[in-house]
Amino acid sequence: MKCPFCGHLETQVVETRVSEDADFVRRRRQCSACDKRFTTYERPDVNFPVVVKKDGSRADFESGKVRASMMLALRKRPVSIEQIDNALLRIEQKLLASGLREIDSTKVGELVMRELKKLDKVAYVRFASVYRSFEDVDEFRQLLRDI
């Protein structure tokens, strides 16, 4: 596998772990040129449900977009990248287990909110305030009461 740091084509696997559910394999790799380490995740190639947006348009589910929105909500919070990746994997598993061909973007947002609530309450509030488009302070108060 190509090293993401220097582009060298030779890397060695130094550690391999199978997830608790045996749904994916996590591998730590080390570049033989620059000696830097990086993590890769190996999982089956599957078809996620198509996301139906609020305006009715459809788009492929993109894990990267979900991860980026979670990272933004979790910015400067004490949550590890591994915890975020595990939460993202749980979201993906729920989408696949649903058996649906299409899913509303609101359902995806709710899945993200559930995972953020487990990881970090502040990140949950950050995400919810944008996702639900809060208009006033009372909506924040209600959300905080629900936590």
Swiss-Prot record:
Signal peptide: none annotated. The keyword Acetylation does not apply. The lineage of its organism: Bacteria, Pseudomonadati, Pseudomonadota, Betaproteobacteria, Burkholderiales. The keyword Nucleotide-binding applies. Belongs to the NrdR family. NCBIfam families: transcriptional regulator NrdR (TIGR00244). Negatively regulates transcription of bacterial ribonucleotide reductase nrd genes and operons by binding to NrdR-boxes. Keywords: ATP-binding, DNA-binding, Metal-binding, Nucleotide-binding, Repressor, Transcription, Transcription regulation, Zinc, Zinc-finger. A zinc finger (unnamed) spans 3-34. This is Transcriptional repressor NrdR. Its cofactor is Zn(2+).
